[in-house]
Every structure is written in structure tokens, then in C-alpha cells.
């Protein structure tokens, strides 16, 4: 057995993908260097799509990875983890992402609506997974936090870049007075 299995760890994902009904990438976020180049990533995505787009199942094993997926109208959602990762946790991430987008897009989860709201997608993915580590599994919380990003967020919930931007704004206004 590998030492990796024996070490306690947080639940992690290797990638989150959204492909259209032709297998083309709409969104892809890889959290490790399993596929370091864009060429390798796109080849992997085509391979996943070819294996999964005609089946009704929700899970596949491909290239030593566990892939959970779901389709909606003209989109295919994928969450990829190692072969040792808990499939239920991967499915929880997938359902959280899908349900969050469904709420944000008012149940209109299709390619056109997604492309018009890519910022919300990026924010939702960042709320659910950070650096491959699963942070949130409640779609209500994700939607709430994504909505807050446009408003004043408490300092404890802001990212470093948000804090720096806020500090710049305050300094700028204090100098202009």
C-alpha cells in the first residue's frame, strides 16, 4: 500500500470541469499537476467526455482517477478526484456546484446562461473548493457568499486581495479630502 492512503488528510479534488455538449471546455480548474499542460488537459477532457456523454451513470474510473459527473440540457459537470478519494464527497461537491448554479441562474442551467454569468461560476467554485480542499458543501451558503462578494463583506471573510483593495480605496479617499 502507498503511504498516501495511510496518512490522514482533508477531502480533496483534483479538478472541476464544465464541458458543453460537443465536449469543448467552458470551465476548467485543475488543482494539481496531474495534467500540467493545456494540451494534456484538453486531451483528458475529450477522453472523459467520450467515455461519459452517452451513459446515464454518475461515476467513472478513468486513467486512475475517480470522475463523478452530471449533465444538464447542454452542459456536462465533472468533479475529479484520486482513485482513493471518497466518491460521496466528490458527489457532494458536484451537487453543491450544480445546485448553487441552479439557484444563481434561476434554474436555467444551460450554456448561454452560464456564459453570461461566468463571474458567479468562478466565485462559486472558489467558495466550494480552495486549492483542491473542499471547503463548503451547502449551496445556500455558497449562493449567499457569492452574493456578498459584491457588497461589503466583514473583514474576517474577505480574501487578502479584497482587504488590500479596500485599504487602497480608504487611503485614496482620505488623501482626496
Swiss-Prot record:
PROSITE patterns: CLAT_ADAPTOR_S
Statement: the UniProt record of this protein carries the keyword Cytoplasm: yes
Topology relative to the membrane: Peripheral membrane protein
Post-translational modification N-acetylmethionine, affected residues: 1
Keyword Cytoplasm assigned: yes
Top-level lineage group: Eukaryota
GO cellular component: COPI vesicle coat; Golgi membrane
GO BP: intra-Golgi vesicle-mediated transport; intracellular protein transport; retrograde vesicle-mediated transport, Golgi to endoplasmic reticulum
Subunit note: Oligomeric complex that consists of at least the alpha, beta, beta', gamma, delta, epsilon and zeta subunits.
Protein name: Coatomer subunit zeta-1
Amino acid at each position: 500500500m502507498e503511504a498516501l492512503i495511510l496518512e490522514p488528510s482533508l477531502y480533496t479534488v483534483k479538478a472541476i470541469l464544465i464541458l458543453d455538449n460537443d465536449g469543448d471546455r467552458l470551465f476548467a480548474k485543475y488543482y494539481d499537476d496531474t495534467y500540467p499542460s493545456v494540451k494534456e488537459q484538453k486531451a483528458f477532457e475529450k477522453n472523459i467526455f467520450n467515455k461519459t456523454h452517452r451513459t446515464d451513470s454518475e461515476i467513472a474510473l478513468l486513467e486512475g482517477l475517480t470522475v463523478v459527473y452530471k449533465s444538464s440540457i447542454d452542459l456536462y459537470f465533472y468533479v475529479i478526484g484520486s482513485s482513493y478519494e471518497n466518491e460521496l464527497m466528490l458527489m457532494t461537491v458536484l451537487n453543491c456546484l450544480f445546485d448553487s448554479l441552479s439557484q444563481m441562474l434561476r434554474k436555467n442551467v444551460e450554456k448561454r446562461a452560464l456564459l453570461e454569468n461566468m463571474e458567479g461560476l468562478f466565485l462559486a467554485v472558489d467558495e466550494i473548493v480552495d486549492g483542491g480542499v473542499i471547503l463548503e458543501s451547502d449551496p445556500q451558503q455558497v449562493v449567499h457568499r457569492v452574493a456578498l462578494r459584491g457588497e461589503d463583506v466583514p473583514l474576517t471573510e474577505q480574501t487578502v486581495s479584497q482587504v488590500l483593495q479596500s485599504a487602497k480605496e480608504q487611503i485614496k479617499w482620505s488623501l482626496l479630502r
